[in-house]
UniProtKB/Swiss-Prot annotation:
Oligomer and partners: Homodimer. Probably interacts with its editing subunit.
Function: Catalyzes the attachment of threonine to tRNA(Thr) in a two-step reaction: L-threonine is first activated by ATP to form Thr-AMP and then transferred to the acceptor end of tRNA(Thr). Also activates L-serine and transfers it to tRNA(Thr) but cannot deacylate incorrectly charged amino acid; unlike most archaea the editing function is found in a freestanding protein.
GO cellular component: cytoplasm
CDD domains the record matches: ThrRS_anticodon, ThrRS_core
Protein source organism: Saccharolobus islandicus (strain L.S.2.15 / Lassen #1) (Sulfolobus islandicus)
Binding residues annotated for Zn(2+), in chain numbering: 231, 282, 410
SUPFAM superfamilies in the cross-refs: Class II aaRS ABD-related (SSF52954), Class II aaRS and biotin synthetases (SSF55681), ThrRS/AlaRS common domain (SSF55186)
Similarity section: Belongs to the class-II aminoacyl-tRNA synthetase family.
Subcellular location: Cytoplasm
Nucleus listed as a keyword: no
Superkingdom, natural source: Archaea
EC number in record: 6.1.1.3
Protein name: Threonine--tRNA ligase catalytic subunit
Amino acid sequence: MESYKPVWLKGAVILAINLIDKGYKPVAVGLGERDFYIDVKSDTSITLDEVKKAINENVLANVSIENNQIVYKGNKVSIIEDKVSISTNLNPKYFEILNISTHHPNPNEQYVRIRGVAFETEEQLKDYLTWLEKAEETDHRLIGEKLDLFSFHEEAGSGLVLFHPKGQTIRNELIAFMREINDSMGYQEVYTSHVFKTDIWKISGHYTLYRDKLIVFNMEGDEYGVKPMNCPAHILIYKSKPRTYRDLPIRFSEFGHVYRWEKKGELYGLLRVRGFVQDDGHIFLREDQLREEIKMLISKTVEVWHKFGFKDDDIKPYLSTRPDESIGSDELWEKATNALISALQESGLKFGIKEKEGAFYGPKIDFEIRDSLGRWWQLSTIQVDFNLPERFKLEYIDKDGIKKRPVMVHRAIYGSIDRFVAILLEHFKGKLPTWLSSVQVRVLPITDEVNEYAEKVLNDMRKRRIRAEIDYAGETLSKRIKNAYDQGVPYILIVGKKEASEGTVTVRARGNIEVRNVKFEKFLELLITEIAQRDVEQTTVKALK
């Protein structure tokens, strides 16, 4: 997806200029997750035919780009994009308008938002539209609505998600798994506030280099910011008491709520939000401990992705190097970069290089994961930081009694838990592994006469902490089976008079697999094991066949 964005942005610029030539007033262009967008100031709606007529001329004559604005015939159009630049080498000729909508930035103004894509060849466009049609069938926003997982509400604010009980169940399972991973590496979990005085962000450098994402407000004469990252708070915990070389490494973890003011046109379901939770971690350690710590993090990261069924070919690490806007000396950056390279090489992983895509305080390893639709998602990150310990004057007492600076490592394996939920929903097409499913078993009594037995089966599962529910015989059995499949329930237990008299169940699983005359206790034992082991496949039904 990322590889398409330069040509999309160029296409958006071309279309904006064409719209100006047709008498329209575009005010901004930008990129979404799957397309470009153009905001046009207009008191009336704009039809698809009108937009298509504006795609006839693809000439960038008499156009200049100044201060991230398109300047053309007295018009200035803002370019809402800071990661993708406009290339003179690209020549988009084939356009597709995907959507036209209206929104009101204030009560007195109306904008028409045009969403589309552009490619250099007709074949690229056709391939993308075919892929997009397939992707829309597994759109996490539609799955989330169908399965009652989460919702967004304009009155609550754009990019601010509300997780419903079933959606929160998925998040809780992801957090519980990561807690186990953290425990295995020796982390101590902390909690820090959502809001801090901006003094902390000024010391860290976020106030200057991350200012456009910071949400800042004034109260009682002091300036506060809603935290976009957890690292400065963890630094203050480290500073709260003296540390010695024997204490290191110190590993803090937090499922921290962070908030970043993403541009409205870039918001996209759970994939791009303004408030989310990170599985964050920070390690304070000596330089001589750095390489082994990074190697352990790399190993654990790969272990986690294997648990979700991703193969080695689906996992691609990148070394991201120093960006143009950064803090710290060349010497510190070189030292940090070399530590990451050594750990990657010793781990035996093939890795790519992303020039100038490191954090402003240090280089990093980013892991990209390929989903079932062939898309690559940047998720895990490991960042080495010599700079924030210097800026916050962190210290530990070395064995020779001298005060020294620790090194800091920032890491997140899921990245954003909310975003990871979206990726999993699309990757598994709403059919999550049993351990992650909000409802793991649905019991279907064939008639009301066996309700008592069905309820006993239900309650026995709930006592064993299995998320089970019952669908009584209000509709036909085939209709209830279809409903359970459509709602992503991994296991369906059908009980009739025969099952009630014999203490058995008929088990149905995904893929229209059915196993009859299964002793309920045997099913329960196998299911508990499948869930405890966090299997991706339905090992219970495999063992029963």
